[in-house]
């Protein structure tokens, strides 16, 4: 985390032996959703922000990644480990409460890259999902034997 005033020094938000990533700040700036593998698999957690040690709630069960807040602040979305987009109703006032998860849609194969590949429209009515077309026959691998000689032939050094 980097403060925008003062010396602008970068400091880790979490200092654990686990992997925490894909953090998303709630629209009101009070809550931080993120994924962590502290349970042995990636799950979705929410903490108060910036006082992250004042509480922690696990929203997903059975695996979760890539949390994204709805702009209205009353819904948190995440992706299961099998590629299903889930929705959790939340209250993000001075305290944090949440309900159960419900299925939104199954994401297309090829959209499950490591980064944030989806978002929700400001009105909450549509989703944008970045995906790639399935390729016939799989990926191609080209092996070049004696590659140094081939490089010298293509790029002669005089």
PLM regions and their residue ranges:
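Conserved beta-propeller blade repeats
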Residues: 13, 17-35, 56-77, 110-126
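Beta-propeller blade-edge and WD-like acidic-aromatic loop motif
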Residues: 1-14, 30-31, 35-58, 72-75, ...
């Amino acid at each position: 985390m980097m403060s925008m005033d003062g010396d602008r020094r970068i400091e880790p938000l979490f200092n654990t032996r686990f992997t925490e990533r894909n953090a998303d700040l709630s629209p009101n700036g009070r809550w931080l959703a993120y994924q962590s593998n502290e349970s042995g698999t990636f799950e979705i957690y929410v903490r108060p922000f910036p006082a992250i040690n004042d509480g922690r709630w696990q929203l997903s069960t059975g695996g979760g990644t890539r949390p994204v807040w709805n702009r209205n602040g009353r819904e948190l979305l995440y992706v299961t480990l099998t590629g299903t987009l889930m929705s959790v109703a939340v209250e993000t006032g001075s305290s944090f409460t949440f309900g159960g998860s419900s299925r939104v849609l199954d994401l297309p194969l090829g959209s499950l890259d490591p980064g944030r590949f989806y978002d929700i429209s400001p009105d909450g009515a549509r989703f944008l999902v970045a995906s790639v077309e399935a390729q016939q026959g799989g990926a191609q691998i080209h092996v070049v034997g004696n590659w140094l000689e081939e490089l010298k032939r293509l790029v002669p050094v005089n």
